[in-house]
């Protein structure tokens, strides 16, 4: 009986960090499918962030950033802050219970492509002074879609 308890405790102890490590691998990994680059990361509070770059390095490139944050949607039009500078973006907020999902859409291809070039130079983007977008494998993204938001 004692061996079973020790084995069970060891299994729980070692499997929890293993599962945690498995979950972490899903963040900060770039994927590509149908000419769309996808990345998921998180805010400093642990809320998920989804970044999608459509048609990167083309004249039709655009960017969508969506993330969950605490609070209610209000009438104020939020701005997208990238590396300390405001980037022209269309803003939309969706209320989900006590939280909200902020969506930013950037349609200026030159701005989007400069962000892609910046990331491909192995630099990290900082969005909203809180969200780090890592370059990691953006030069050789995995094929497929990111995990569910």
Regions found by a protein language model. Give the residues of each.
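Sec-dependent signal peptide recognition
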Residues: 2-9
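A generic "folded-domain core" signal
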Residues: 19-149
């Amino acid at each position: 009986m004692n061996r079973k308890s020790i084995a069970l405790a060891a299994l729980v102890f070692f499997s929890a960090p293993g599962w945690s490590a498995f979950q972490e691998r899903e963040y900060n990994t770039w994927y590509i499918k149908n000419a769309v680059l996808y990345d998921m990361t998180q805010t400093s509070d642990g809320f998920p962030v989804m970044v999608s770059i459509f048609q990167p390095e083309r004249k039709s490139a655009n960017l969508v950033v969506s993330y969950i944050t605490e609070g209610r949607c209000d009438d104020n039009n939020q701005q997208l802050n990238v590396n300390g500078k405001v980037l022209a973006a269309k803003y939309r907020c969706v209320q989900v219970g006590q939280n909200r999902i902020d969506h930013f859409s950037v349609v200026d291809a030159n701005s989007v492509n400069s962000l892609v070039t910046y990331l491909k130079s192995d630099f990290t983007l900082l969005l909203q002074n809180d969200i780090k977008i890592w370059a990691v494998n953006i030069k050789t993204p995995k094929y497929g879609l990111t995990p569910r938001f």
